[in-house]
Amino acid sequence: MQMLAQREDKLINQDWSFRFSHQVNANAARRVDLPHTWNAQDALGGKHDYKRGIGNYTKKIFIRPEWQSKRLFLRFEGANCVSNVFVNGKHIGEHRGGYGAFVFEITDKVEYGKENTLLVRVNNGEQLDVMPLVGDFNFYGGIYRDVHLLLTDNLCISPLDYASSGVYLIQQQITDKQAAICARINLSNGTGELRKAVLRLQVNDEKKTVYETEKEVSMIPHTDVQVENIEFILKNPRLWNGTQDPFMYQTVVTLIKDGKELDKVEQPLGVRYYITDPDKGFFLNGKHLPLHGVCRHQERAEVGNALYPVSYTHLRAHETTLHLVC
Protein backbone atom coordinates (compact mmCIF):
# COMPACT_ATOMS: atom_id res chain seq x y z
CA MET A 1 0.00 0.00 0.00
CA GLN A 2 1.38 3.37 -1.02
CA MET A 3 1.98 5.89 1.76
CA LEU A 4 0.81 9.48 1.44
CA ALA A 5 2.98 12.52 0.75
CA GLN A 6 4.75 13.86 3.82
CA ARG A 7 4.76 17.64 3.24
CA GLU A 8 3.19 19.71 6.01
CA ASP A 9 2.23 23.37 5.78
CA LYS A 10 1.72 25.09 9.14
CA LEU A 11 0.34 28.63 9.26
CA ILE A 12 2.14 30.55 12.02
CA ASN A 13 0.28 33.87 11.92
CA GLN A 14 -0.80 33.94 15.56
CA ASP A 15 0.88 35.38 18.66
CA TRP A 16 3.67 37.55 17.35
CA SER A 17 5.21 40.38 19.35
CA PHE A 18 5.83 43.73 17.66
CA ARG A 19 7.74 46.89 18.50
CA PHE A 20 9.60 49.55 16.57
CA SER A 21 13.39 49.38 16.54
CA HIS A 22 13.68 52.63 18.49
CA GLN A 23 11.54 51.18 21.30
CA VAL A 24 14.39 49.62 23.25
CA ASN A 25 12.19 48.88 26.26
CA ALA A 26 10.78 45.37 25.91
CA ASN A 27 7.60 46.54 27.64
CA ALA A 28 6.81 48.61 24.54
CA ALA A 29 6.13 45.43 22.56
CA ARG A 30 2.54 44.50 21.81
CA ARG A 31 0.92 41.28 20.67
CA VAL A 32 -0.17 41.16 17.03
CA ASP A 33 -1.48 38.57 14.63
CA LEU A 34 -0.46 38.46 10.99
CA PRO A 35 -1.11 39.87 8.46
CA HIS A 36 -0.05 43.16 10.08
CA THR A 37 1.09 46.63 9.09
CA TRP A 38 2.09 49.48 11.38
CA ASN A 39 0.57 51.94 8.89
CA ALA A 40 -3.05 50.79 9.15
CA GLN A 41 -4.11 54.10 10.71
CA ASP A 42 -1.69 56.74 9.44
CA ALA A 43 -1.23 55.99 5.74
CA LEU A 44 -4.70 56.48 4.31
CA GLY A 45 -4.94 60.19 5.11
CA GLY A 46 -3.49 61.24 1.77
CA LYS A 47 -0.31 62.67 3.28
CA HIS A 48 3.29 61.50 3.11
CA ASP A 49 4.09 61.72 6.81
CA TYR A 50 3.14 58.14 7.70
CA LYS A 51 5.64 56.04 9.66
CA ARG A 52 8.53 54.69 7.60
CA GLY A 53 11.23 52.87 9.51
CA ILE A 54 12.11 49.52 11.09
CA GLY A 55 9.73 47.21 12.90
CA ASN A 56 10.70 44.06 14.81
CA TYR A 57 8.47 40.98 14.85
CA THR A 58 9.32 38.16 17.25
CA LYS A 59 7.67 34.80 17.85
CA LYS A 60 8.36 31.80 20.06
CA ILE A 61 7.87 28.50 18.29
CA PHE A 62 8.39 25.00 19.67
CA ILE A 63 10.28 22.71 17.29
CA ARG A 64 9.24 19.14 17.95
CA PRO A 65 12.02 16.54 18.35
CA GLU A 66 10.50 14.21 15.74
CA TRP A 67 11.03 16.91 13.11
CA GLN A 68 14.76 16.13 13.07
CA SER A 69 14.09 13.76 10.18
CA LYS A 70 12.47 16.59 8.20
CA ARG A 71 13.57 19.73 6.42
CA LEU A 72 12.14 23.02 7.71
CA PHE A 73 11.46 26.14 5.67
CA LEU A 74 10.00 29.53 6.54
CA ARG A 75 7.80 30.98 3.79
CA PHE A 76 6.78 34.65 3.83
CA GLU A 77 4.08 35.65 1.37
CA GLY A 78 4.78 39.37 1.70
CA ALA A 79 6.72 41.83 3.88
CA ASN A 80 7.56 45.40 2.90
CA CYS A 81 10.13 46.18 1.90
CA VAL A 82 13.47 44.88 3.25
CA SER A 83 13.28 41.91 5.61
CA ASN A 84 16.01 40.29 7.69
CA VAL A 85 15.21 36.97 9.34
CA PHE A 86 16.91 35.63 12.48
CA VAL A 87 16.52 32.30 14.31
CA ASN A 88 17.77 32.20 17.90
CA GLY A 89 19.77 35.36 17.26
CA LYS A 90 21.49 34.03 14.13
CA HIS A 91 20.95 35.81 10.83
CA ILE A 92 19.30 33.49 8.30
CA GLY A 93 18.95 35.77 5.32
CA GLU A 94 17.73 39.02 3.82
CA HIS A 95 15.00 39.64 1.27
CA ARG A 96 14.90 42.94 -0.61
CA GLY A 97 11.58 43.83 -2.19
CA GLY A 98 8.09 44.22 -0.80
CA TYR A 99 5.87 42.52 -3.34
CA GLY A 100 7.07 38.96 -3.66
CA ALA A 101 7.13 35.85 -1.49
CA PHE A 102 10.41 34.49 -0.13
CA VAL A 103 11.62 31.31 1.57
CA PHE A 104 14.54 30.47 3.85
CA GLU A 105 15.56 26.99 5.00
CA ILE A 106 16.09 26.72 8.76
CA THR A 107 16.67 22.95 9.10
CA ASP A 108 20.11 23.26 10.70
CA LYS A 109 19.42 26.58 12.43
CA VAL A 110 16.80 25.45 14.97
CA GLU A 111 17.09 23.54 18.25
CA TYR A 112 14.88 20.47 18.27
CA GLY A 113 12.75 19.67 21.28
CA LYS A 114 13.03 23.29 22.43
CA GLU A 115 11.34 26.64 22.07
CA ASN A 116 13.00 28.73 19.36
CA THR A 117 12.85 32.47 18.76
CA LEU A 118 12.07 33.95 15.37
CA LEU A 119 12.91 37.59 14.71
CA VAL A 120 11.90 39.36 11.51
CA ARG A 121 13.23 42.89 11.13
CA VAL A 122 11.22 44.76 8.48
CA ASN A 123 12.18 48.15 7.06
CA ASN A 124 9.82 50.25 4.91
CA GLY A 125 12.16 53.23 4.80
CA GLU A 126 13.26 54.55 1.42
CA GLN A 127 15.69 52.16 -0.27
CA LEU A 128 17.36 53.55 -3.38
CA ASP A 129 18.17 50.05 -4.67
CA VAL A 130 14.70 48.58 -4.11
CA MET A 131 11.95 49.24 -6.63
CA PRO A 132 9.60 50.99 -6.84
CA LEU A 133 11.01 54.28 -5.57
CA VAL A 134 7.78 56.25 -6.05
CA GLY A 135 4.17 55.45 -6.79
CA ASP A 136 0.57 56.56 -6.37
CA PHE A 137 0.27 54.24 -3.39
CA ASN A 138 1.50 53.92 0.18
CA PHE A 139 4.63 52.00 1.14
CA TYR A 140 3.09 50.12 4.05
CA GLY A 141 5.52 48.61 6.53
CA GLY A 142 5.10 45.18 8.09
CA ILE A 143 4.52 41.49 7.46
CA TYR A 144 1.34 42.06 5.50
CA ARG A 145 0.74 38.49 4.29
CA ASP A 146 0.76 34.98 5.77
CA VAL A 147 3.83 33.22 7.18
CA HIS A 148 4.18 29.44 6.90
CA LEU A 149 6.41 26.77 8.39
CA LEU A 150 6.93 24.09 5.74
CA LEU A 151 8.06 20.58 6.67
CA THR A 152 9.27 18.25 3.93
CA ASP A 153 11.23 15.05 3.49
CA ASN A 154 14.99 15.28 2.91
CA LEU A 155 14.13 14.72 -0.75
CA CYS A 156 11.53 17.24 -1.89
CA ILE A 157 10.15 19.46 -4.61
CA SER A 158 12.14 22.60 -3.88
CA PRO A 159 10.45 25.74 -2.50
CA LEU A 160 13.74 27.65 -2.75
CA ASP A 161 13.43 29.01 -6.30
CA TYR A 162 12.04 32.46 -5.48
CA ALA A 163 9.40 30.83 -3.24
CA SER A 164 7.70 29.20 -6.21
CA SER A 165 5.79 25.95 -5.94
CA GLY A 166 8.74 24.26 -7.62
CA VAL A 167 6.61 23.30 -10.62
CA TYR A 168 6.65 25.52 -13.72
CA LEU A 169 4.28 24.69 -16.59
CA ILE A 170 5.65 26.17 -19.81
CA GLN A 171 3.17 26.30 -22.68
CA GLN A 172 5.35 25.73 -25.74
CA GLN A 173 2.79 25.50 -28.53
CA ILE A 174 -0.97 25.72 -28.13
CA THR A 175 -3.70 25.22 -30.73
CA ASP A 176 -7.33 24.22 -30.60
CA LYS A 177 -6.27 20.63 -31.34
CA GLN A 178 -3.35 20.09 -28.98
CA ALA A 179 -1.25 21.69 -26.26
CA ALA A 180 2.49 21.03 -26.01
CA ILE A 181 3.58 21.61 -22.40
CA CYS A 182 6.92 21.35 -20.62
CA ALA A 183 6.80 20.81 -16.86
CA ARG A 184 9.97 22.20 -15.28
CA ILE A 185 10.26 20.64 -11.84
CA ASN A 186 12.74 21.81 -9.21
CA LEU A 187 14.01 19.06 -6.93
CA SER A 188 16.13 19.33 -3.79
CA ASN A 189 18.25 16.73 -2.01
CA GLY A 190 19.15 17.66 1.55
CA THR A 191 21.29 14.57 2.14
CA GLY A 192 24.95 13.97 1.39
CA GLU A 193 24.27 11.01 -0.89
CA LEU A 194 23.03 10.52 -4.44
CA ARG A 195 19.43 9.35 -4.25
CA LYS A 196 17.28 7.63 -6.89
CA ALA A 197 13.61 8.54 -7.05
CA VAL A 198 10.63 8.67 -9.39
CA LEU A 199 8.66 11.71 -10.54
CA ARG A 200 5.02 11.12 -11.36
CA LEU A 201 3.08 13.76 -13.30
CA GLN A 202 -0.70 13.68 -13.62
CA VAL A 203 -2.98 16.16 -15.37
CA ASN A 204 -6.58 16.07 -14.17
CA ASP A 205 -9.71 17.71 -15.48
CA GLU A 206 -12.91 18.01 -13.46
CA LYS A 207 -13.64 14.28 -13.61
CA LYS A 208 -10.59 12.19 -14.49
CA THR A 209 -6.88 11.99 -15.22
CA VAL A 210 -6.27 13.00 -18.84
CA TYR A 211 -2.51 12.45 -18.84
CA GLU A 212 -0.04 10.55 -16.66
CA THR A 213 3.63 9.68 -16.88
CA GLU A 214 6.62 8.80 -14.68
CA LYS A 215 10.32 9.62 -14.88
CA GLU A 216 13.25 8.18 -12.95
CA VAL A 217 15.60 10.80 -11.52
CA SER A 218 18.98 10.83 -9.76
CA MET A 219 19.00 13.54 -7.09
CA ILE A 220 22.38 15.22 -6.56
CA PRO A 221 23.60 15.54 -2.92
CA HIS A 222 23.23 18.86 -1.09
CA THR A 223 21.34 20.54 -3.94
CA ASP A 224 18.85 23.37 -3.38
CA VAL A 225 17.46 23.35 -6.92
CA GLN A 226 17.93 20.55 -9.47
CA VAL A 227 15.83 20.99 -12.62
CA GLU A 228 14.05 18.06 -14.27
CA ASN A 229 11.88 18.50 -17.37
CA ILE A 230 8.87 16.44 -18.43
CA GLU A 231 7.31 17.26 -21.81
CA PHE A 232 3.79 16.17 -22.68
CA ILE A 233 0.90 16.84 -25.06
CA LEU A 234 -2.78 17.30 -24.27
CA LYS A 235 -5.08 16.39 -27.15
CA ASN A 236 -8.11 18.60 -27.83
CA PRO A 237 -7.46 20.76 -24.76
CA ARG A 238 -10.18 22.69 -23.03
CA LEU A 239 -9.01 26.27 -23.45
CA TRP A 240 -9.07 28.82 -20.67
CA ASN A 241 -11.14 31.98 -21.08
CA GLY A 242 -11.32 34.26 -18.06
CA THR A 243 -14.85 35.53 -18.67
CA GLN A 244 -16.56 32.67 -20.49
CA ASP A 245 -14.86 29.49 -19.28
CA PRO A 246 -12.12 30.00 -16.64
CA PHE A 247 -11.38 26.27 -16.54
CA MET A 248 -8.00 25.09 -15.32
CA TYR A 249 -6.51 21.62 -15.28
CA GLN A 250 -4.87 20.46 -12.07
CA THR A 251 -1.32 19.23 -12.57
CA VAL A 252 -0.14 16.97 -9.75
CA VAL A 253 3.59 16.25 -9.40
CA THR A 254 4.57 13.55 -6.90
CA LEU A 255 8.07 12.56 -5.77
CA ILE A 256 8.26 8.84 -4.95
CA LYS A 257 10.99 6.63 -3.50
CA ASP A 258 10.64 2.90 -2.85
CA GLY A 259 6.87 3.13 -3.29
CA LYS A 260 6.51 5.94 -0.74
CA GLU A 261 5.21 9.36 -1.70
CA LEU A 262 7.76 11.80 -0.29
CA ASP A 263 6.31 15.05 -1.61
CA LYS A 264 3.46 16.32 -3.74
CA VAL A 265 2.66 19.67 -5.39
CA GLU A 266 -0.52 20.62 -7.22
CA GLN A 267 -0.25 23.36 -9.83
CA PRO A 268 -3.21 24.76 -11.83
CA LEU A 269 -2.88 24.94 -15.61
CA GLY A 270 -4.98 27.25 -17.77
CA VAL A 271 -4.28 26.33 -21.40
CA ARG A 272 -4.60 29.25 -23.81
CA TYR A 273 -2.93 31.08 -26.65
CA TYR A 274 -3.04 34.75 -27.52
CA ILE A 275 -1.71 37.39 -29.87
CA THR A 276 -1.70 41.17 -29.89
CA ASP A 277 -2.03 43.28 -33.03
CA PRO A 278 -1.31 47.04 -32.99
CA ASP A 279 -4.29 47.69 -35.25
CA LYS A 280 -6.79 44.95 -34.40
CA GLY A 281 -6.11 44.54 -30.68
CA PHE A 282 -5.95 41.48 -28.45
CA PHE A 283 -6.99 37.96 -29.48
CA LEU A 284 -7.49 35.11 -26.99
CA ASN A 285 -7.72 31.60 -28.42
CA GLY A 286 -8.18 33.05 -31.89
CA LYS A 287 -11.06 35.35 -30.96
CA HIS A 288 -10.97 39.11 -30.51
CA LEU A 289 -11.33 40.17 -26.90
CA PRO A 290 -11.65 43.80 -25.74
CA LEU A 291 -9.57 44.50 -22.65
CA HIS A 292 -10.66 46.74 -19.79
CA GLY A 293 -8.95 47.39 -16.49
CA VAL A 294 -8.74 49.59 -13.44
CA CYS A 295 -6.09 50.56 -10.91
CA ARG A 296 -7.03 48.80 -7.68
CA HIS A 297 -4.60 49.05 -4.80
CA GLN A 298 -4.22 46.28 -2.20
CA GLU A 299 -5.58 48.23 0.75
CA ARG A 300 -8.69 48.63 2.88
CA ALA A 301 -9.74 51.12 5.53
CA GLU A 302 -8.61 50.24 9.08
CA VAL A 303 -6.26 47.44 7.96
CA GLY A 304 -4.15 49.08 5.25
CA ASN A 305 -2.57 46.42 3.06
CA ALA A 306 -2.69 43.69 5.74
CA LEU A 307 -5.58 41.95 4.05
CA TYR A 308 -7.52 39.04 5.52
CA PRO A 309 -9.67 36.59 3.49
CA VAL A 310 -12.79 38.66 4.14
CA SER A 311 -11.01 41.66 2.60
CA TYR A 312 -10.48 39.76 -0.65
CA THR A 313 -14.15 38.75 -0.66
CA HIS A 314 -15.20 42.40 -0.50
CA LEU A 315 -12.71 43.44 -3.16
CA ARG A 316 -13.74 40.69 -5.57
CA ALA A 317 -17.40 41.51 -5.09
CA HIS A 318 -16.60 45.09 -6.05
CA GLU A 319 -14.56 43.97 -9.06
CA THR A 320 -17.55 42.15 -10.54
CA THR A 321 -19.33 45.49 -10.87
CA LEU A 322 -16.43 46.83 -12.96
CA HIS A 323 -16.68 44.07 -15.62
CA LEU A 324 -12.97 43.41 -15.51
CA VAL A 325 -11.34 41.16 -18.07
CA CYS A 326 -8.21 39.52 -16.65
Task: Name what the model sees in each region.
Residues 1-316:
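Secreted/periplasmic carbohydrate-active enzymes, especially glycoside hydrolases
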Residues 314-326:
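Single conserved hydrophobic/aromatic residue that forms the stacking wall/gate
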